Amino acid sequence: MHKFLPIAYFEDKFVPFEDAKISVATHALHYGTAAFGGLRGIPDPEDPGTILLFRLDRHGDRLSKSAKFLHYDISAEKIKEVIVDFVKKNQPDKSFYIRPLVYSSGLGIAPRLHNLEKDFLVYGLEMGDYLAADGVSCRISSWYRQEDRSFPLRGKISAAYITSALAKTEAVESGFDEAILMNSQGKVCEATGMNVFMVRNGQIVTPGNEQDILEGITRDSILTIAADLGIPTCQRPIDKSELMIADEVFLSGTAAKITPVKRIENFTLGGDRPITEKLRSVLTAVTENREPKYQDWVFKIPLNG
């Protein structure tokens, strides 16, 4: 059972979470005309009175750009300002997740984006590990990732996640933890809410942006960290069979962080994951503000400031 943070931002004001309610006729509820983001926050291990948010600037910028697909102009600065105030009002004392959402708040039944009211909301919940930290099993989904020519995949659009929901439930009902989706060319694309990486012969490989993936912020962070560590990286198409015989496979995302993959279909991957574990160790240190080189990725919010 989720434990939601007590205060939400809704209709331009902060209200008790229980009071943030929409009409049954809300356009986004019927047509998926919404876009969302997701950030993790933790109390600073060295100063519990300070909250650390990972890559707030990038998350604000991505949601602002996603909103443009909905014909909604909201600045990244506005998004960041509200999120900072949201954290201060909630005074979290455990690891938590923030969900900002822009959506068509007008009432109606015609699929459109013009002449339609929009709104911006934020809520949050306590969150530990989203997926099992010791690794997950993955099914290759029978559902395919959408194509950018028919869906704005550069935005984090809510409607796109019906495919993720279908793939996730299919995987769980088949006895797996997670699903990996192919794109329309039959190449590895992403998991249900995470980017996919593999390691072969000491090189990190991940599908490039042209493979219809979400341009993940954690993904980008991992590629930067790997390069700084001197680990070779490559962005290119990945075949399904190649993934199954990889030395290491892991998933990345704001909620999932870095999660190892133990098994794909009936192919068990090796238990030694030196590169995955090294990246996970460094990324954890970065999010806890213990890596001076990446301190500009961590936004500090003093709760009593």
Curated annotation (Swiss-Prot):
EC numbers for this chain: 2.6.1.42
Keyword vocabulary terms for this entry: Amino-acid biosynthesis, Aminotransferase, Branched-chain amino acid biosynthesis, Pyridoxal phosphate, Transferase
Pathway: Amino-acid biosynthesis; L-isoleucine biosynthesis; L-isoleucine from 2-oxobutanoate: step 4/4; Amino-acid biosynthesis; L-leucine biosynthesis; L-leucine from 3-methyl-2-oxobutanoate: step 4/4; Amino-acid biosynthesis; L-valine biosynthesis; L-valine from pyruvate: step 4/4
CDD domains xref list: BCAT_beta_family (cd01557)
Catalytic activity, as annotated: L-leucine + 2-oxoglutarate = 4-methyl-2-oxopentanoate + L-glutamate; L-isoleucine + 2-oxoglutarate = (S)-3-methyl-2-oxopentanoate + L-glutamate; L-valine + 2-oxoglutarate = 3-methyl-2-oxobutanoate + L-glutamate
EC primary class: transferase
Gene Ontology MF term list: L-isoleucine-2-oxoglutarate transaminase activity; L-leucine-2-oxoglutarate transaminase activity; L-valine-2-oxoglutarate transaminase activity
N6-(pyridoxal phosphate)lysine modification, residue list: 156
Pfam families: Aminotran_4
GO BP terms in the entry: carboxylic acid metabolic process; isoleucine biosynthetic process; L-leucine biosynthetic process; L-valine biosynthetic process
Required co-factors: pyridoxal 5'-phosphate
NCBIfam families: ilvE_I, PRK06606.1
Protein family membership: Belongs to the class-IV pyridoxal-phosphate-dependent aminotransferase family.
Role according to the record: Acts on leucine, isoleucine and valine.
Record-given protein name: Probable branched-chain-amino-acid aminotransferase
Protein's organism: Synechocystis sp. (strain ATCC 27184 / PCC 6803 / Kazusa)
